[in-house]
């Protein structure tokens, strides 16, 4: 084999996940997009769940083993049934990445109740609904991997981020409890807690973002996605309950 052939073959993604079926929420941008693409590269069949999955699907090569599902995860009453429909369409589910989320910046004294509820519906209750949808299938096959994308804001409170912090603290508690419940069924439930990540979420916050926030010094979605893939690819007999990933620049 020539050096050129060897180099070319070594650059090809290793298809460790051929035959696996994955669902990724918040998959049209940011962390969700990056991890969904890596799952595809690893050979998995991937369902892209977001309000606008066409944004990313239009970028994929023809014939990609991917399908988009336009779902508003904040409309919590219908989430479980819609995820069950995806599982039926895929013919099963092996991997769930709960990534969709939103933030609110402002003092708690000024936060409207409807904004609080909207944040918790997406950041926490939609995760609960997705879990209820996938767990029966994963239990029946006695294996599965679930990764909940939390935040360092689920470990430390930050001023003006009270609602977001509360939702992520709650998500970590949910993850830990479900991990204990599902371990006897062969299902891994893990969390990843990134520090600041330069995602489109910041664009939705407008002038509420302090000028001191240097987005260029934050983690990239690709870096977080690589860490998530490390969790996905762990040996069957290993689990990382909670992975904290921080920017080397020292930002939260």
Identify the residue ranges that each predicted region occupies.
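Conserved glycine-rich cofactor-binding loop
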Residues: 28-29
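Conserved glycine-rich Rossmann-like NAD(P)H-binding loop of the short-chain dehydrogenase/reductase
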Residues: 42-57
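Substrate-binding pocket helix/loop in short-chain dehydrogenase/reductase
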Residues: 107-108, 115-120
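Active-site helix of classical SDR
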Residues: 131, 167
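Residue(s) in the substrate-gating loop at a strand-loop-helix junction
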Residues: 151
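Active-site-adjacent segment of SDR/Rossmann-fold oxidoreductases
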Residues: 156, 177-187
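C-terminal helical subdomain
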Residues: 191, 212-252
